UniProtKB/Swiss-Prot annotation:
Belongs to the MurCDEF family. GO terms for biological process: cell division; cell wall organization; peptidoglycan biosynthetic process; regulation of cell shape. Its EC number is 6.3.2.8. The gene is murC. This is UDP-N-acetylmuramate--L-alanine ligase.
Amino acid sequence: MTAYHFVGIKGTGMSALAQVLHDLGYTVQGSDVEKWFFTQKALEERGIPVLPFSKDNIRPGYTVIAGNAFPDTHEEIEAARQLGVPVIRYHRFLGQLAGKFTSIAVTGSHGKTTTTGLLAHVMQGAHPTSYLIGDGTGKGEPGSKYFVFEACEYRRHFLSYFPDYAIMTNIDFDHPDYFANVDDVFSAFQQMANQVKKAIVACGDDPYLPNIQAKVPILFYGFGEENDFQARNIVKTTEGMAFDVFVRNTFFASFAIPRFGTHNVLNALAVIALCHYEGVDAGTIAKRLQTFQGVKRRFSEKTVGRQVLIDDYAHHPREITATLEAARQKYPGREVVAIFQPHTYTRTQTFLREFAESLLQADHVYLCDIFGSAREHEGKLTIRDLQAQIPRSQLLEEQNVAVLKQHQDAVLVFMGAGDIQKFQQAYERAVLSA
């Protein structure tokens, strides 16, 4: 049996895939930069070796799975080619693995990680299920029939997948370094729809998804009456969301989720529709929905003194709006403070005005310097361009995080897809050392 070596094992998808293969009985190791990432914990708990990059890591008999951020000129990929060791990109390998199961791909511009996690959690209550979530969490369940996995549209990587089912949460313009406009994004999703084998579950309230065409049935979900699966009688509380589901205008069941914001009702509705199609009973779905603990870096909360600190991956204006809405629902009457680190110069430039508008929904805004991706390290834009759009916003650096102490009893919402966590960690240290 081959051993798998992951080039860039700390990436969220790569880490999750390594966990899946390890659980299924394969020998797995990987390499990456030495900087600590939150994805390491699950690897370390399984005893999966994480090595510094070196061409000496590659040996005959291995199969190399390469992260998409690493070029063919990377020393380990070059070493593999010289040794005749097979090299396969992450998304291509994932496509091959998914083909061995009844596969359910979860995709969409927003909400796919939470929806993948929620679907995996609910399906496990009915059948043995393997899963790969984009928060760095993966599980390979020996003997499982189903494989639930997150499918990213970036660079059309999800076109490597030919799933039995696909959930499509929404279509929005994002990744402006790759997609030209929202029509370009739509065309990618249309291509994906053509590759689905059994059925598609799509949000009918989305402006674009109702225009998707496919050779398989499309089940629409949402709040509108024209949807196959409709949520009605929505109740928001400080404990979460409750709602009734009607299937083609006939009452199906009542559900509750310990998550916040109307976007999470839609995420749950997608899961309910897919499970209904696969014959999972309403009682099992309801029970599992109520025990969902969330996914990493999606509204992850902790209390420090009299403040609540929330860590969230939100890095698009629509996601910021949803996260701040959720914070206000759970903590009504408390000051909501946004601490935001923009992710990539191209995205910040493209959505500068929209970022400002979404952040203005907080009571106070702090901005961290722009985080450039692995593909871009600097741009003409600076964080001050965004600051100029947000009255009374302040710049935040790691060494001056103590300024956040003035917001007593507040909800501090740290948002971003880069290394925003280091600001939260620095603040927690500042509070503890006071």
